[in-house]
């Protein structure tokens, strides 16, 4: 009985750790998917533009 309880707790702890780690990785990883000139209106501009930055939520502007 004790072994079953220990295994259940271990699975729950590992599941929680996996969810937390996955969420943190998503926040840390910045995947770009917009090219210069693409609209970034629906994006908050954090890491979406591959070469440049989101200019006031209008379009990706390349760094010069």
UniProtKB/Swiss-Prot annotation:
Cystine pairs annotated here are: 32-50, 40-54, 49-60
Query: Where does this polypeptide localize?
Result: Secreted
Keyword annotations of the record: Disulfide bond, Knottin, Neurotoxin, Secreted, Signal, Toxin
Listed under GO cellular component are: extracellular region
Spans traversing the lipid bilayer:
none
Question: Signal peptide location in the record?
Answer: 1-22
One example GO MF annotation: toxin activity
Expression (tissue specificity):
Expressed by the venom duct.
Per the record, the major location class is: secreted
What function does the entry list? Answer: Probable neurotoxin.
Record note on domains? The cysteine framework is VI/VII (C-C-CC-C-C).
Spell out the protein name for this chain.
Conotoxin Cal6.24
Organism per entry: Californiconus californicus (California cone)
């Amino acid at each position: 009985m004790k072994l079953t309880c220990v295994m259940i707790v271990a699975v729950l702890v590992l599941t929680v750790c996996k969810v937390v780690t996955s969420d943190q990785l998503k926040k840390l990883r910045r995947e770009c998917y917009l090219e210069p000139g693409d609209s970034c209106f629906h994006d908050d501009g954090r890491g979406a533009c591959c070469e440049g930055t989101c200019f006031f939520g209008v379009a990706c502007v390349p760094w010069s």
